[in-house]
From Swiss-Prot:
Homodimer. The keyword Nucleus does not apply. It is an enzyme of class 3 (hydrolase). GO terms for molecular function: hydrolase activity, acting on ester bonds. PANTHER family: SIDEROPHORE TRIACETYLFUSARININE C ESTERASE (PTHR40841), SIDEROPHORE-DEGRADING ESTERASE (EUROFUNG) (PTHR40841:SF2). Contains a proline-rich insertion between residues 112 and 122 that forms a kinked, partly disordered turn that decreases the diameter of the active site, making it too narrow for the extended, flat TAFC, while the compact, cylindric enterobactin is still able to enter. SUPFAM superfamilies: alpha/beta-Hydrolases. InterPro entries: AB_hydrolase_fold, Esterase-like, Siderophore_Hydrolase_D. This is Siderophore enterobactin esterase. Its EC number is 3.1.-.-. It catalyses: enterobactin + 3 H2O = 3 N-(2,3-dihydroxybenzoyl)-L-serine + 2 H(+). Belongs to the esterase D family.
Length: 303
């Protein structure tokens, strides 16, 4: 009879991953999780290697999915340029989303209209910190990753991925500081937020082409077909479904994405532009395919 031996390993340990907590902000620290190709050394010393980088906001919810997506691809395409994942999140253990995200991921605004809660009443949130958060990523996180963690790696394309408020943040970064990243992956962006004030930024970006002449960014928009047209869930009451329908109709996810795509396409301001609708996916379920599709989109740009 075979005797099997079970030896404990460090809880949650996985190859070629590391994490840091970043202190210095009065509202609380951040956490970054980083992964790199399995063909590199465990220390991340990859002298002479080149790589793309994808930065994720809401990092607690997205880091492992992005890492696994890339590792599956890399196992089949070993000669392809590798990708480093940098997930910016929060040191939390009881959820994958932090309340701090509403401040960090929403643009500053002169007049604020609170979003509605599930009962239809206004639900004010902390908001308007997107500029500060973008500066933190560009001036604190990115230099740490490129100069301290991977000083011998030559980085090529850099991408920013965000979903929902994170998608809104990606659009804000594109429209206000387009040279921050090469590729913007905006999944289910909350264009509806604050009476669609992000569209003012979009039109300023389009009309101010001369101000951003050195930036030739790429944008991929994505959303689920059931975001604007929800399907009733089996355990959902008539009242709950009607509330969800009303909210979906007001937020116009599908129409907003398609209209923004058309406006940007006509402007010719982007090096490449794509919109992708994922059939039978809602706002929550679309995260996986949108993230995977965004990573494939980035990888194919470099293929």
């Amino acid at each position: 009879m075979t005797h099997w031996a079970f030896s404990p390993i460090q809880p949650g340990a996985a190859r070629n991953m590391a994490a840091w907590q970043i202190a210095g902000k009065k509202d609380g620290p951040y956490q970054i999780d980083v992964s790199w190709p399995l063909t590199w050394s465990e220390s991340g010393d990859a002298s002479g290697k080149s790589a793309n980088a994808v930065y994720l906001v809401d990092g607690n919810a997205l880091f492992l999915t992005a890492t696994e997506t890339l590792r599956r691809r890399e196992s089949h395409r070993p000669s392809e340029t590798g990708t480093v994942v940098i997930a910016i999140g929060y040191p939390i253990t009881d959820s994958v989303f932090s309340p701090r995200r509403s401040y960090d991921l929403t643009p500053p605004c002169d007049h604020y209209i609170p979003p509605e809660g599930p009962d239809g009443s206004p639900k004010p949130e902390a908001h308007g910190g997107a500029d500060e958060f973008l500066t933190f990523i560009a001036e604190i996180v990115r230099p740490f990753v490129e100069l301290k963690v991977f000083p011998r790696v030559s980085f090529g394309r850099t991408a920013l991925f965000g979903h929902s408020y994170g998608g809104l943040f990606a659009l804000h970064a594109l429209f206000t500081k387009p040279s921050s990243f090469d590729v913007y992956l905006a999944a289910s962006p909350s264009i509806w937020w604050n009476n669609r004030s992000i569209l003012t930024e979009a039109r300023r970006f389009i009309s101010g082409a001369a101000l951003f002449s050195s930036a030739h960014p790429v944008l991929r928009l994505s959303f689920g077909s059931r975001e604007q047209y929800p399907v009733r869930q089996r355990v959902e009451s008539d009242e709950m479904f009607k509330r969800r329908q009303r909210a979906a109709e007001q937020r116009r996810m599908n129409d907003n994405c398609e209209e923004l795509y058309s406006e940007l396409l006509a402007s010719g301001r982007l090096c490449k532009l794509e919109v992708k609708e994922y059939l039978d996916e809602d706002h929550g379920s679309v995260i996986g395919p949108a993230l995977s599709g965004g990573i494939m989109f980035l990888s194919n740009l470099s293929a």
